[in-house]
């Protein structure tokens, strides 16, 4: 049974709630002091994990639509991608403000050079920015075939973002590995397209 347009609309509402409610939980956690003795790190990790979850969810849409024979699911991909960018931006802001401080924001450039995992993170964010800015139908029409080429850069983000996470943790735990393996599986499902894009 294929999903209807009405069901897709409700699915989009569910995506909004699933992506927005964690932000309210984040605010409440800060207000109530639910984080550990290092809340800045907790916030950075939380926002980073949310970004990765939404990135993986975005990549999952096409295989689900194709193998599940649900073509209308593709209509959810843009929304997931925009939420991924929103959480990625929050992740970047949380590091810049909480880790460096507003008075030392100029240190960000030096940090990017001395900490390679940050370089991967900022590259991932810049790619997400380019995808978010060009996610409109107007941009798609104006760019023509180049639009798809640009948006295939999400595969690069799917490689860099899990590496950024793995590299950033001081003690290796199962969670970063799970994200990396999941990303690898999702890329493997699109092996032919990924290989064509790499050429």
Curated annotation (Swiss-Prot):
InterPro entries xrefs: Fe3_Rdtase_TM_dom (IPR013130), MsrQ-like (IPR022837)
Co-factor: note: Binds 1 FMN per subunit.
Presence of keyword Cell inner membrane: yes
Disulfide bonds: none
Molecular function (Gene Ontology), one example: FMN binding
Cofactor: FMN; heme b
Membrane topology note: Multi-pass membrane protein
A GO biological process held by the record: protein repair
Entry's Gene Ontology cellular component terms: plasma membrane
Pfam families noted in UniProt: Ferric_reduct (PF01794)
Transmembrane segments: 10-30, 79-99, 118-138, 147-167, 169-189
Subcellular location: Cell inner membrane
Keywords in alphabetical order: Cell inner membrane, Cell membrane, Electron transport, Flavoprotein, FMN, Heme, Iron, Membrane, Metal-binding, Transmembrane, Transmembrane helix, Transport
Subunit details: Heterodimer of a catalytic subunit (MsrP) and a heme-binding subunit (MsrQ).
Protein role: Part of the MsrPQ system that repairs oxidized periplasmic proteins containing methionine sulfoxide residues (Met-O), using respiratory chain electrons. Thus protects these proteins from oxidative-stress damage caused by reactive species of oxygen and chlorine generated by the host defense mechanisms. MsrPQ is essential for the maintenance of envelope integrity under bleach stress, rescuing a wide series of structurally unrelated periplasmic proteins from methionine oxidation.
Protein family according to the UniProt entry: Belongs to the MsrQ family.
Protein name according to UniProt: Protein-methionine-sulfoxide reductase heme-binding subunit MsrQ
Source organism per UniProt: Yersinia enterocolitica serotype O:8 / biotype 1B (strain NCTC 13174 / 8081)
Name of the gene: msrQ
């Amino acid at each position: 049974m294929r999903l209807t347009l009405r069901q897709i609309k409700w699915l989009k509402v569910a995506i909004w709630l699933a992506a927005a409610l964690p932000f309210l939980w984040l605010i409440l956690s800060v207000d109530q002091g639910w984080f550990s003795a290092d809340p800045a790190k907790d916030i950075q990790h939380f926002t980073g994990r949310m970004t990765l979850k939404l990135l993986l969810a975005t990549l999952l849409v096409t295989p689900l639509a194709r193998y599940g024979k649900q073509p209308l699911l593709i209509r959810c991909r843009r929304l997931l991608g925009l939420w991924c960018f929103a959480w990625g931006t929050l992740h970047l802001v949380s590091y810049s403000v909480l880790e460096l401080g507003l008075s030392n924001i100029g240190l960000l450039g030096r940090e990017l050079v001395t900490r390679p995992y940050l370089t991967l993170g900022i590259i991932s964010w810049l790619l997400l920015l380019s995808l978010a800015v060009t996610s409109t139908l107007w941009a798609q029409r104006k760019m023509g075939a180049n639009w798809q080429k640009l948006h295939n850069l999400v595969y690069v983000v799917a490689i860099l973002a899990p590496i950024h996470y793995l590299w950033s943790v001081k003690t290796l735990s199962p969670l970063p590995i799970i994200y990396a393996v999941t990303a690898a599986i999702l890329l493997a499902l699109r092996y032919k397209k990924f290989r064509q894009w790499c050429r």
